[in-house]
């Protein structure tokens, strides 16, 4: 999609869909001007539909005018209550109203109600992401009909064009994550994830190292390798690195859970466990791969970014790990596997040990880890666990800037006793109450205490059955925008 600024006023703009933001309490807005332009009684028409400009309201009118085929009015709510997220919602509403039409969208919102650079950027992102459609696996793909151009209208300075330069890289990263999560497990395998990383490395000049099973064995990754014992698919440990063109004063590691399919193992998923949806158990890896796709194009300076994904399947055969087996992670910790369906933390354990060996300034992992987090926070908010207040604040700020829900949860150390094993150093699961907390405490065992580390559980946010806002139904690409925002903030810190 081509995105540009236009100084044209709505009275003179020509295109396919003209979308105007109407604030609550401002009943006239652009309505008189539109009535004059199109010779219609727009006010009466809106009154019949009881349109008041409330947040979430919208009204569309087919004009059959050669210079403007459709008029879309988007309710913004009270003008004084507008925030950056209001512009995301408005952009998504404009996109939804423009589906099945070609040509261009002209979008006019009260850009100066917030930082105009932020407003135009998030609105443009929302339009593009809301128009996303995945037709890859249909024998007869439905034509994806939508406008090819977006013009942001109003008296905006041309300097804001530079703010729009980040729209494509960020959206491309989100779209990659959506594609990876949505694809079936016979398409996205551990090898396919490694191939995706290889393609990215080739196209964007990143460094790539892929550890095969023998390499992981040599490094003592018994925790990770125990998970893939029952699969015919070879595991892949993927290490992708972005290095800035100038000196790097910060190094961060992004770790993503990469279970391309999770049967639960001998603790087989049944009933509400949604075994049919366990293709999305690699949502963490999709998020970090998508973030690296964006970072590679944005080229932030001053920060070196490492991405780690320990990818495999959790399947059942005669060689699969048993409940009760004891394995040894690469830091020497012994783990009693009392639940084979708590496998993600076993793969992350060795990934976090590896991440610590890189001696970074911070480690952030993303994982579809626990159903307990979904019960606690639902499907719009991810959980954040960290013992580092500074890291928590920076991630919460990045998530807010990105428009992604994130809520800090307690690292209640007293629950650590629930991981005690009679035979090994620890068990991989604790009691059912507080399950998302004990999962985070388990992961903490594999991170050097001197390194700031955060765990983000995206089990609820990775998928949307019905769609919401700028996320059509299906994979959301959650986490990409937050990670990119956070990494770019590291650049600013490095400059200071």
From Swiss-Prot:
Q: Where are the transmembrane segments?
A: none
Which residues of this UniProt protein bind Mn(2+) 2?
Answer: 257, 262, 281, 343
This chain belongs to the protein called: Probable cytosol aminopeptidase
Q: Name one Pfam family in it.
A: Peptidase_M17_N
What is the stated purpose of this protein? Presumably involved in the processing and regular turnover of intracellular proteins. Catalyzes the removal of unsubstituted N-terminal amino acids from various peptides.
Keywords per UniProt: Aminopeptidase, Cytoplasm, Hydrolase, Manganese, Metal-binding, Protease
- Provide the catalytic activity annotation: Release of an N-terminal amino acid, Xaa-|-Yaa-, in which Xaa is preferably Leu, but may be other amino acids including Pro although not Arg or Lys, and Yaa may be Pro. Amino acid amides and methyl esters are also readily hydrolyzed, but rates on arylamides are exceedingly low; Release of an N-terminal amino acid, preferentially leucine, but not glutamic or aspartic acids
CDD domains hit by this protein: Peptidase_M17 (cd00433)
- PANTHER family to which the protein is assigned, alphabetical: CYTOSOL AMINOPEPTIDASE, LEUCINE AMINOPEPTIDASE-RELATED
Gene expressing this chain: pepA
Q: Family membership, please give it.
A: Belongs to the peptidase M17 family.
The Gene Ontology CC terms held by the record are: cytoplasm
GO terms for MF: manganese ion binding; metalloaminopeptidase activity
The principal localisation class reads: cytoplasm
Cellular location(s): Cytoplasm
What's the record's note on cofactor binding?
A: Binds 2 manganese ions per subunit.
User: What EC number is given for this enzyme?
Assistant: 3.4.11.1, 3.4.11.10
Q: Where is the active site?
A: 269, 345
Which InterPro entries does the UniProt record give?
A: Leucine_aapep/pepB, Macro_dom-like, Peptidase_M17_C, Peptidase_M17_leu_NH2_pept, Peptidase_M17_N
Q: State its cofactor.
A: Mn(2+)
- List, in alphabetical order, the GO biological process terms annotated in this UniProt record: proteolysis
Kindly report, in one word, the top-level EC class recorded for this enzyme: hydrolase
What residues bind Mn(2+) 1, as annotated?
262, 341, 343
């Amino acid at each position: 999609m081509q995105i540009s600024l236009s100084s044209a006023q709505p009275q003179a703009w020509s295109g396919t869909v003209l979308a105007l933001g109407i604030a609550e309490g401002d009943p006239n807005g652009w309505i008189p001007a539109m009535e004059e332009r199109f010779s219609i009684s727009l006010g009466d028409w809106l009154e019949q539909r009881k349109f008041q400009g409330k947040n979430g309201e919208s009204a569309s009118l087919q004009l059959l005018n050669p210079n403007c085929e459709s008029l879309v009015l988007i309710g913004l709510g009270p003008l004084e209550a507008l925030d950056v997220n209001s512009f995301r919602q408005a952009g998504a509403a404009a996109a939804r109203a423009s589906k099945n039409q070609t040509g261009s969208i002209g979008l006019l919102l009260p850009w100066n109600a917030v930082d105009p650079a932020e407003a135009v950027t998030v609105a443009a992102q929302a339009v593009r992401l809301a128009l996303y459609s995945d037709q890859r696996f249909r024998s007869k793909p439905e034509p994806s009909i939508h406008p090819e151009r977006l013009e942001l209208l109003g008296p905006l300075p041309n300097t804001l064009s530079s703010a729009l330069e980040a729209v494509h890289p960020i959206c491309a990263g989100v779209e990659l994550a959506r594609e990876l999560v949505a694809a079936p497990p016979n398409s996205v395998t551990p090898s396919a994830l490694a191939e995706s990383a290889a393609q990215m490395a080739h196209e964007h000049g990143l460094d790539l190292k892929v550890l095969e099973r023998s390499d992981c064995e040599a490094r003592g990754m018994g925790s990770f390798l125990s998970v893939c014992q029952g699969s015919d698919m070879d595991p892949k440990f993927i290490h992708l690195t972005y290095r800035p063109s100038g000196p790097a004063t910060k190094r961060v590691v992004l770790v993503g859970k990469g279970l391309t399919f999770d049967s639960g193992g001998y603790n087989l998923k049944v009933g509400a466990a949604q075994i049919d949806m366990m293709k999305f158990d690699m949502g963490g890896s999709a998020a970090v791969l998508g973030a690296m796709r964006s970072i590679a194009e944005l080229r932030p300076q001053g920060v070196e970014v490492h991405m780690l994904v320990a990818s495999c399947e959790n399947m059942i055969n005669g060689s699969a790990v048993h409940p009760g087996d004891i394995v040894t992670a690469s830091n020497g910790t012994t783990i009693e596997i009392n639940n084979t369906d708590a496998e993600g933390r076993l793969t992350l354990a060795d990934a976090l040990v590896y991440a610590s060996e890189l001696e970074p300034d911070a480690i952030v992992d993303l994982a579809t880890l626990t159903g307990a987090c979904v019960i606690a926070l639902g499907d719009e908010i991810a959980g954040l666990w960290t013992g580092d207040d500074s890291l928590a604040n920076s991630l919460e700020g990045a998530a807010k800037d990105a428009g992604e829900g994130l809520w800090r949860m307690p690292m209640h150390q007293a629950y650590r006793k629930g991981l005690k094993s009679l035979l090994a150093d620890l068990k991989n699961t604790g009691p059912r109450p507080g399950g998302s907390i004990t999962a985070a405490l388990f992961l903490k065992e594999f991170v050097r205490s001197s390194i700031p580390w955060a765990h983000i559980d995206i089990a609820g946010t990775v998928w949307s059955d019905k769609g919401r806002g700028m996320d059509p139904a299906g994979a959301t690409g959650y986490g990409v925008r937050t990670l990119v925002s956070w990494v770019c903030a590291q650049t600013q810190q490095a400059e200071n």
